[in-house]
């Protein structure tokens, strides 16, 4: 029940945040909603070509805070954090997997594929097969076909 509430809250905040962020020429990357002891923590990750500035974060925080307050989301006190996605950018939407083909990624699955739950390798392709979206990952010189719907978390891997 709690997970469904958090999922719905995340979706509702995403719907409100996306047009606010887009109006400033930015792209919404991810929304996280975490229930803390006495309040909610809402994290908004956004990006644009050339990166996000501190002024961008401040402006979106002010605008989005007002929008969330008007819609009473979340329904209890909350802290709003707005930032860039960082070097280990989360991969959330289909277009993220398409955009970052050829890049190194880290993927955690809800169940094992070929005996493996955590993958770290190069994202070679993102395709649709028989109505199912599949990531083709090269890891340790072997190819793995990972169903998109099994992914719990996916991020870019940045090498220093």
From Swiss-Prot:
Keyword Metal-binding in record: no
PANTHER family, A to Z: RIBOSOME MATURATION FACTOR RIMP (PTHR33867:SF1)
Organism name: Syntrophus aciditrophicus (strain SB)
Domain of life: Bacteria
InterPro entries: Ribosome_maturation_RimP, RimP_C, RimP_C_sf, RimP_N, RimP_N_sf
Keywords: Cytoplasm, Ribosome biogenesis
Function: Required for maturation of 30S ribosomal subunits.
Originating gene: rimP
Name the UniProt record assigns to this protein: Ribosome maturation factor RimP
The UniProt record lists the keyword Oxidoreductase: no
Coiled coil: none
Gene Ontology biological process terms in this record: ribosomal small subunit assembly; translation
One term under GO cellular component: cytosol
Family: Belongs to the RimP family.
Subcellular localization(s) per the UniProt record: Cytoplasm
């Amino acid at each position: 029940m709690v997970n469904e509430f958090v999922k719905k809250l995340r979706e509702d905040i995403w719907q409100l945040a996306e047009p606010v962020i887009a109006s400033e020429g930015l792209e919404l990357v991810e929304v996280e909603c975490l229930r803390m002891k006495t309040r909610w923590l809402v994290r908004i990750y956004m990006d644009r070509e050339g990166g996000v500035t501190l002024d961008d974060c401040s402006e979106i925080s002010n605008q989005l805070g007002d929008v969330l307050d008007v819609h009473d989301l979340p329904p209890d006190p909350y802290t709003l954090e707005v930032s860039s996605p960082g070097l280990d950018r989360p991969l959330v939407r289909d277009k993220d997997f398409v955009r970052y083909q050829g890049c190194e990624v880290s993927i955690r699955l809800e169940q094992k594929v070929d005996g493996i739950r955590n993958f770290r390798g190069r994202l070679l392709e993102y395709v649709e097969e028989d109505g199912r979206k599949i990531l083709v990952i090269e890891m340790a010189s072997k190819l793995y076909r990972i169903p998109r719907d099994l992914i719990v978390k996916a991020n870019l891997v940045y090498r220093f």
